[in-house]
A protein has these predicted regions:
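Short alpha-helical donor nucleotide-sugar binding micro-motif in glycosyltransferases
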Residues: 159, 167-172
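Carbohydrate-associated surface elements
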Residues: 44, 65
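Nucleotide-activated donor-binding/catalytic signature segment of Leloir-type glycosyltransferases, i.e.
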Residues: 140-159
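Nucleotide-sugar donor phosphate/pyrophosphate-binding loop at the beta->alpha transition
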Residues: 2-5, 13-34, 76
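Aromatic "clamp/platform" in nucleotide-sugar-dependent glycosyltransferases that forms part
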Residues: 180
Length: 278
């Protein structure tokens, strides 16, 4: 018999908020039962799969990774970084907040917008740059206009090539990913590799909370409830109120990536599981 390994990033019920296609869910369930091993991307997903009846004894978690040589702040030219900030009208002495991701409800970007008036009252010299595409594009524009903050929000509803995305990370001061469902969330790893402090959703099935240490000497970011704009605002101000501390968090983030989140580490952990089945 040839062993079968089923790799699972997300599930139909998770992506669709408990709704979705029964046919797809049934196929996922059937494959889980047939497989000798299930590999998923976080311990949060491992527990969620078990909660929905998948056999826990079969499920292993192997984190995703990032290329820290490619995502390296020190390889970005200062003039290229300055061009990004200039493009979005962010002066050198202002703070640039960055969100990158699909513009869909699970990513929490609407909740981030609702957090911004509170942030801007305390830190008016701040701009939020939103990079992504999705069904919430019109809602994002309407929400920022309704909240009276459209002059402090920059949208770019476009696919941005990787090299340019890296420059956006380099140009930012803090990266915010307030997801309410995120099996892993590679954007926070990319930001961490670029030495940026991160504010991440950490309630529910969210892999961010395994990447980001939110207290102690190795802290590299802040955990928030992605469904609560008040909590998101609190998380952002925790970073903005102390630039020196934020720099230290960014350095800690890259150290954590180098230790736990390289693709070599992913390959080694995955190979161990495969070898155990042979």
């Amino acid at each position: 018999k040839i062993p079968v390994v089923f790799h699972v990033h997300s599930t139909e019920w998770g992506r669709a908020g408990g709704q979705g296609s029964e046919v797809v869910s049934d196929l996922e369930w059937a494959m889980a039962n047939k497989a000798d091993k299930v590999i998923t991307v976080s311990y949060a997903m491992q527990q969620d799969l078990a909660k929905h009846g998948w056999p826990l004894s079969k499920i292993s978690a192997v984190w995703n990774g990032v290329d820290p040589e490619r995502y390296n702040q020190r390889k970005c030219k200062k003039e290229d970084i300055a061009k990004i900030r200039e493009k979005y009208g962010v002066p050198e002495d202002w703070s640039m907040l960055l969100f990158i991701g699909r513009l869909t409800w699970v990513k929490g970007v609407r909740n981030l917008l609702q957090a911004m008036p509170s942030v801007l009252r305390e830190y008016p010299n701040t701009k939020l740059v939103i990079l992504g595409m999705g069904e919430q594009q019109n809602d994002i524009v309407e929400t920022s206009e309704r909240l009276g903050i459209k002059d402090k929000i920059v949208y770019r509803f476009d696919f941005v090539p990787e090299d340019e995305r890296i420059l956006h990370y380099a140009a930012s001061d803090v990266c915010i990913f307030p997801s309410v469902y995120e099996p892993f969330g590679i954007v926070s790893l990319e930001a961490m590799s670029m030495e940026k402090p991160v504010v991440v959703g950490a309630r529910g099935v969210v892999g961010f909370k395994e990447q980001v240490i939110s207290s102690g000497p190795e802290q590299n970011g802040v955990h928030v409830n992605g469904e609560d704009p008040v909590d998101i605002a609190w998380g952002i101000t925790q970073v903005l109120q102390n630039p020196e501390k934020a720099r230290n968090w960014g350095e800690n983030g890259r150290k954590r990536v180098l230790e736990y989140f390289t693709w070599r580490k992913v390959a080694e952990e995955t190979a161990k599981i495969y070898e155990a089945l042979l």
